[in-house]
């Protein structure tokens, strides 16, 4: 397991999309986290504050949003954690113990 934080210590914003659609008498909500290619794996599209504002603004032009999808990934600080973080009985600072 890894603990990921922004390289510059700011807040992480993840891009997502959602839709509400009716089925009979119930409205279903659906969400999806948007990803971008990152080496050989995929990771969420992480936005800075300006990217977050553009992503949430319904007036943002499509080409600007496409630019966010193609942007360089925001650097993250990666720390390997001990496996105790996988124990559902534990829910405290000890879960952030380095490996």
Question: What positions do the PLM features span?
Answer:
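A structured binding-face within diverse protein domains that lines the active/interaction site
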Residues: 1-99
